[in-house]
């Protein structure tokens, strides 16, 4: 009998302990949710302002989300060329990409690249990062992309070659000039008299070295970081065009985020893109110093530059007729960019 009483006492004593243990387990903190990973790919090397500004974006986003979003950056076309990265962003296997092939983001962005449309980098930023830029960016969703903001891909574009100095449009006749597959560049260079060859950005150096192309066109920053000056002899400063640098994200992925996270990404994209634009200005000055020592430089006089402008005017008529832009839109850009 005594043994039975002792056994019952043991059971009674253990029951509260068991309940206490259960309640402690229930009160244990939930596991911390995994951070959201945002993979961003681009084609420029790590020394380019695009990469440096994306590092700034990463710093801002991870700080403002307290590590809730982790940004991974893949430079130098590690994830494929610009076309492949744009397609991956549309599919959602890549969350974001910047720059390059903006025509595929929306043909409306071609309006930025019309020859001699802008007179200053400050004017470019007013347009691309203002209400006009927002209206143009909105067209990207028709092509399965969402543009957080649009910046400057490197400043005004110049022409280099290894055959002769370019002083007049006639000097370009017969020269094979490499260009990306952007219609406005192709049409403009053809209007100048050049024979255009389309070659991927990452293959341009070897194409110039092998003579597949006689020359190319790019901003100072790109010419310097890609070392195109090593395989060229002449540089003509013509400031004929600039390229936009859209910050493209996958719409479904972006809209799956909380409104708070969406706002953080948008704000950080704008802040880092302004930083990008400033970096480009500084890098352009440094790159030009390299150009002066490596190439024979021709700076066009206003009268010489006007001859190129006159040749390029046919490009405007063609794209207005195609319906990509209107004269009213061009006039608005000119007015805002002053």
Tell what function each PLM region has.
Residues 1-4:
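Positively charged n-region of N-terminal signal peptides that target proteins for export
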Residues 6-7, 54:
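General helical structural elements
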Residues 8-17:
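Bacterial N-terminal signal peptides
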Residues 17-23:
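Juxtamembrane cytosolic interface motif at the C-terminal end of transmembrane helices
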Residues 23-123, 132, 140-338:
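N-terminal secretory/targeting leader peptides
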Residues 136:
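Basic phosphate/pyrophosphate-binding loop/patch that engages nucleotide-derived ligands
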């Amino acid at each position: 009998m005594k043994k039975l009483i002792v056994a019952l006492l043991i059971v009674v004593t253990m029951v509260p302990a068991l309940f206490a243990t259960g309640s402690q387990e229930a009160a244990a903190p939930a596991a911390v949710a995994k951070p959201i990973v945002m993979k961003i790919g681009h084609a420029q090397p790590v020394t380019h302002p695009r990469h440096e500004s994306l590092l700034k974006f990463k710093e801002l986003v991870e700080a403002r989300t307290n590590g809730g979003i982790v940004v991974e950056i893949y430079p130098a076309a590690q994830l494929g060329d610009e076309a492949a990265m744009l397609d991956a962003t549309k599919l959602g296997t890549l969350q974001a990409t910047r720059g390059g092939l903006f025509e595929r983001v929306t043909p409306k962005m071609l309006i930025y690249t019309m020859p001699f449309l802008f007179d200053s980098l400050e004017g470019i930023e007013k347009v691309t990062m203002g209400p006009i830029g927002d209206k143009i960016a909105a067209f990207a969703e028709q092509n399965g992309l969402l543009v957080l903001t649009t910046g400057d891909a490197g400043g005004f574009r110049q022409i280099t070659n290894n055959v002769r100095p370019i002083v007049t449009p006639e000097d370009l006749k017969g020269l094979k000039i490499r260009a990306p597959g952007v219609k406005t560049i192709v049409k403009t260079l053809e209007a100048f008299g050049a024979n255009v060859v389309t070659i991927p950005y990452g293959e341009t150096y070897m194409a110039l070295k092998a003579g597949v192309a006689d020359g190319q066109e790019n901003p100072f920053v790109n010419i310097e970081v890609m070392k195109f000056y090593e395989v060229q002899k002449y540089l003509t400063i013509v400031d004929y065009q600039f390229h936009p640098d859209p910050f493209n994200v996958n719409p479904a992925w972006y809209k799956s985020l909380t409104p708070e996270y969406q706002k953080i990404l948008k704000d950080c994209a704008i802040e880092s893109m302004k930083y990008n634009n400033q970096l480009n200005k500084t890098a352009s000055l440094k790159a030009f110093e390299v150009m002066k020592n490596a190439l024979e430089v021709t700076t066009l006089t206003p009268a010489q530059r006007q001859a190129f402008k006159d040749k390029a005017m046919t490009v405007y008529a063609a794209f207005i007729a195609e319906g990509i832009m209107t004269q009213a839109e061009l006039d608005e850009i000119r007015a805002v960019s002053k």
